[in-house]
């Protein structure tokens, strides 16, 4: 490594924590960690620290949790750290140009897509949902636009027919830190230069919400199968049967036709449901108050509940 840098790290979820963990194993000095304020979580709505905050405190690092970085006081606090570089990973706050200009080498971001495809908040899930053949991590030099900065480094990985949002997340969380460390070395040595993104190729990965996780049986089965995988483990696709909510955590393409949402067949292989085009076989479900189960287990004990002819989602 050419030189050890003073680095400010900014990130919030587990994906970001994996990057911080890797940086802590380098000679670089993490002079402060920025993360989102503690948020209410769980049934008790108790204030919970982020994954990044927990890791930072374990290592005795100073933790900053500003509500915003747009005010002069927060910017002066950042400037006082005399950072060479700011590494930003899924932080969740907009960084104004005044902040981007503070570190000597600027700010870099590890983004979980092959930019310019899937700029925005949910690139991992949108890639699976869209049926993309590959995904990856892009390390970019940040600018004021959303994920629009010059690309410093890209690493890619195929998306398999079995990948879920969770499995792809974990793979990218392993690839991203290595790419960031390589990019930092190139920046420090002055050998790495950004490639301008082609805005004409840009797509936007809208933030996930629970409302869109409701399965629309009028859609083609191939799209619903990808949606189930993309939204596992969160927000988890769901439907209803006889007014009872039903979470769908696993599905495969099946054969059959009928009115959308109609149960065509129940067997140990799964619950076959007619879609707008084709049919979807539900293979892993969660009933109210229960845990996720393979449909074969539900079929053994509740087969009468899943009789053919019933309509899901009504």
Curated annotation (Swiss-Prot):
PANTHER family: METHIONYL-TRNA FORMYLTRANSFERASE, METHIONYL-TRNA FORMYLTRANSFERASE, MITOCHONDRIAL
Any one annotated GO CC term: cytosol
Enzymatic reactions: L-methionyl-tRNA(fMet) + (6R)-10-formyltetrahydrofolate = N-formyl-L-methionyl-tRNA(fMet) + (6S)-5,6,7,8-tetrahydrofolate + H(+)
EC number of the protein: 2.1.2.9
HAMAP family listed in its UniProt record: Formyl_trans (MF_00182)
Cystine residue pairs: none
Alphabetized CDD domains for the sequence: FMT_core_Met-tRNA-FMT_N, Met_tRNA_FMT_C
GO MF: methionyl-tRNA formyltransferase activity
Originating organism: Pseudomonas aeruginosa (strain LESB58)
Entry-linked Gene3D superfamilies: Formyl transferase, C-terminal domain, Formyl transferase, N-terminal domain
Binding-site positions, (6S)-5,6,7,8-tetrahydrofolate: 113-116
Name of this chain's protein: Methionyl-tRNA formyltransferase
Chain's role: Attaches a formyl group to the free amino group of methionyl-tRNA(fMet). The formyl group appears to play a dual role in the initiator identity of N-formylmethionyl-tRNA by promoting its recognition by IF2 and preventing the misappropriation of this tRNA by the elongation apparatus.
Enzyme's top EC category: transferase
Entry-linked PROSITE patterns: GART (PS00373)
């Amino acid at each position: 490594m050419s030189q050890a840098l003073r680095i400010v790290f900014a990130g919030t979820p587990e994906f970001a924590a994996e990057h911080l963990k890797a940086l802590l194993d380098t000679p670089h000095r993490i002079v402060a960690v920025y993360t989102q304020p503690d948020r209410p979580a769980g049934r008790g709505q108790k204030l919970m620290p982020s994954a990044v905050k927990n890791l930072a405190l374990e290592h005795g690092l100073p933790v900053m949790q500003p509500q915003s970085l747009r005010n002069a006081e927060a910017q002066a606090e950042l400037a006082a750290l005399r950072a060479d570089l700011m590494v930003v990973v899924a932080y969740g706050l907009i960084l104004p140009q005044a902040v981007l200009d503070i570190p000597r080498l600027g700010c870099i971001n590890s983004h979980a897509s092959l930019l310019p495809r899937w700029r925005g908040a949910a690139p991992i899930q949108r890639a699976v949902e869209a049926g993309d053949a590959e995904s990856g991590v892009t390390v970019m030099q940040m600018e004021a636009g959303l994920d629009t900065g010059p690309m410093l480094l890209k690493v890619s990985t195929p998306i398999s027919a079995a990948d879920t949002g969770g499995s792809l997340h974990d793979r990218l969380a392993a690839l991203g830190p290595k790419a960031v460390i390589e990019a930092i070395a190139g920046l420090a040595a002055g050998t790495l230069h950004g490639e301008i993104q082609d805005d004409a190729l840009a797509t936007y990965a809208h933030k996930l919400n629970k409302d869109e996780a409701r399965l629309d049986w009028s859609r083609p089965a191939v799209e619903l199968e990808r949606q189930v995988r993309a939204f596992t483990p969160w927000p988890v696709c769901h439907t209803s049967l006889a007014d009872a909510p039903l979470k769908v955590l696993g599905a495969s393409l099946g054969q059959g036709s009928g009115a959308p949402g109609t149960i065509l067949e129940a067997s140990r292989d799964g619950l076959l449901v007619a879609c707008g085009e084709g049919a979807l076989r539900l293979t892993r479900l969660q009933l109210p108050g229960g845990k996720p189960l393979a449909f074969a287990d539900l079929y053994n004990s509740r087969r009468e509940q899943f009789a053919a002819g019933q309509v899901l989602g009504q």
